[in-house]
Amino acid sequence: MTQQSPAFISPIWLKREQLIDVPEPIMLDWLFNQDSLTRRLDRLSDGGFSVFPQFEGWQALRRDECLALGLPLASEGWVREVYLCGNDSNWVFARSVAARSALQDGGLNMDELGTRSLGELLFSDPAFARGTLEVCHYPEAWLPDAVAARGLWARRSRFSRGALSVLVAEVFLPALCNTIHDKDPV
């Protein structure tokens, strides 16, 4: 589990048109691509994609997560943190959250995913609608120690199906960035 953030840490999540610090074109393409990241990573790894769970459980959601989901601050939710891996290398740190009340009524069993990708589930159910992609430089303090670094790009979006909303944040780790540059030039 990543450490709980100090109250003063709050990233500024921006839409594409709000970016001032614009990443290079290849990274911009990956950050704002609307397709399934799971499928894209599977292609990039030539079928060597896997999910490595780090933490799953109930906890108070972060301020930015509550705001994005329209919840009262410090609402409790299910938190799932995983590495999305390509050929046994950590490519993405993903944190997915949903409010307890929405999960209890929404018929999504996030606690039963195990090593299955949440993205696979969300993109296979046409009832889920994806909201706007937003990006930021993810706070180093929010990352697991094994991959903590400054200035890593992250994206997030909200997936909604009726009253159920799941907020998915994906942090692009250096190993993915290196692989993208080597194998997937724009």
Curated annotation (Swiss-Prot):
Keywords carried by this UniProt record: Cytoplasm, Lyase, Pyruvate, Ubiquinone biosynthesis
Highest taxon listed in the record's lineage: Bacteria
Subcellular location: Cytoplasm
GO molecular function: chorismate lyase activity
Reaction(s) catalysed (UniProt annotation): chorismate = 4-hydroxybenzoate + pyruvate
Enzyme Commission no: 4.1.3.40
Record flagged with keyword Nucleotide-binding: no
Binding site for substrate: 80, 118, 170
GO cellular component labels: cytosol
Biological process (GO), any one: ubiquinone biosynthetic process
One Pfam family of this chain: Chor_lyase
SUPFAM superfamilies linked to this entry: Chorismate lyase-like
Pathway the protein contributes to: Cofactor biosynthesis; ubiquinone biosynthesis
Function: Removes the pyruvyl group from chorismate, with concomitant aromatization of the ring, to provide 4-hydroxybenzoate (4HB) for the ubiquinone pathway.
PANTHER family: CHORISMATE PYRUVATE-LYASE
Record-stated family: Belongs to the UbiC family.
Name of the protein: Probable chorismate pyruvate-lyase
Originating organism: Pseudomonas savastanoi pv. phaseolicola (strain 1448A / Race 6)
The encoding gene: ubiC
